[in-house]
């Protein structure tokens, strides 16, 4: 590094060791007499800075980043499926046959064991399911890590890959406070709900996953966004949720059902037209659930002052 190099230099004119480095000109200059001690210095170090060993290791690594969502973490190479050479020209029939044969052998080299085959299928399925649910990268990676641990402990054996993948996705969503109900996941991914629930309970128990308790508050932004509600309505619903949080009426109830009922109350108070059926479909619950939770919550809110809640929201 230039700073370290400066300590070893000495001015040939005055003998001073107080040498400074000029980053703009690439010169080492004596701070006492101004003599240029060394010029045209080329810094061989990296152009980035790192403040921790972990950051230095991460930024210093060359090549593509490792990813748990790929069965081999992305370490192996893949022969391009397009039959073209480096200049973009199509290969001759003879060359295409040769490349096809190389692809086959390369695939066999990548997938050698039963675990490799399982992970290849599972990671492809995970990618497909995560795209259907519009999940962010961090949840996909969390789900992939959980699945790998389940494979290592032999929890996948005898169970369908689709059900296990759906279960680890549900667990990853819970861990990252991304509200997704089992019913929603089972419906969108077209898997058996009971089987997914069974796999989820097994995985969380055997892997000792610390999954936070589902919070109805987490469901409100998702439902509000899906219904394209105004920001003030969502904020009003969250204020209502704060008022009833911890109340006995919420104990043992489905968080999605409570959130749906609170959203319904908020849209009614704000004069927005939304039906119970519409809200229930988005929340992944039944109309009956929304109706029952609505009645219970309204009894509690009637003891409070809804206008006071609205004033609190308006002040912000």
Curated annotation (Swiss-Prot):
Record-level GO BP terms: transcription preinitiation complex assembly
Regions crossing the membrane: none
Superkingdom per UniProt: Archaea
Zinc finger (TFIIB-type): 7-38
Positions of the UniProt region annotated as Disordered: 51-73
Sequence repeats by residue range: 124-207, 218-299
SUPFAM superfamilies registered for this protein in UniProt: Cyclin-like, Zinc beta-ribbon
SMART domains given in the database record: CYCLIN (SM00385)
Binding site for Zn(2+): 11, 14, 30, 33
GO CC annotations, alphabetized: transcription preinitiation complex
Alphabetical UniProt keywords: Metal-binding, Repeat, Transcription, Transcription regulation, Zinc, Zinc-finger
Keyword Repeat attributed: yes
Gene3D superfamilies in the cross-refs: 1.10.472.170, Cyclin-like (1.10.472.10)
Reported function: Stabilizes TBP binding to an archaeal box-A promoter. Also responsible for recruiting RNA polymerase II to the pre-initiation complex (DNA-TBP-TFIIB).
Name this polypeptide is given: Transcription initiation factor IIB
Gene name as annotated: tfb
């Amino acid at each position: 590094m230039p700073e370290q190099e400066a300590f070893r230099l000495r001015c040939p004119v005055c003998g001073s060791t107080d040498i400074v480095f000029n980053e703009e000109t690439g010169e080492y200059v004596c701070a006492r007499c101004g003599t240029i001690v060394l010029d045209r210095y080329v810094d061989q170090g990296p152009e980035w800075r790192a403040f921790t060993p972990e950051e230095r290791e991460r930024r210093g690594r060359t090549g593509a980043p490792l990813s748990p969502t790929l069965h081999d973490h992305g370490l192996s190479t893949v022969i391009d499926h397009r039959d073209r050479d480096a200049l973009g020209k199509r290969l001759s029939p003879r060359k295409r046959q040769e490349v096809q044969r190389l692809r086959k052998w390369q695939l066999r080299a990548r997938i050698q064991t039963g675990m490799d085959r399982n992970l290849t299928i599972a990671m492809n399925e995970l990618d497909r399911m995560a795209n259907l649910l519009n999940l962010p990268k961090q949840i996909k990676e969390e789900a992939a890590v959980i699945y790998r641990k389940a494979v290592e402990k032999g929890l996948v054996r005898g169970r369908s890959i689709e059900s296990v993948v759906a279960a680890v996705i549900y667990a990853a969503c819970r861990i990252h406070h991304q509200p997704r109900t089992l019913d929603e996941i089972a419906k969108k991914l077209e898997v058996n709900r009971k089987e997914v629930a069974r796999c989820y309970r097994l995985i969380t128990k055997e892997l000792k996953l610390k999954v936070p308790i589902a919070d109805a508050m987490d469901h409100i932004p998702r439902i509000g966004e899906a219904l394209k509600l105004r920001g003030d309505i969502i904020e009003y619903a969250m204020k209502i949720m704060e008022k009833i949080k911890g109340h006995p009426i919420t104990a043992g109830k489905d968080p999605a059902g409570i959130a749906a009922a609170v959203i319904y109350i908020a849209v009614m108070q704000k004069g927005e037209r939304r039906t119970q059926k519409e809200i229930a479909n988005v929340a992944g619950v039944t109309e009956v659930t929304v109706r029952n939770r609505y009645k219970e919550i309204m009894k509690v809110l009637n003891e409070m002052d809804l206008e006071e809640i609205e004033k609190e929201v308006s002040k912000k």
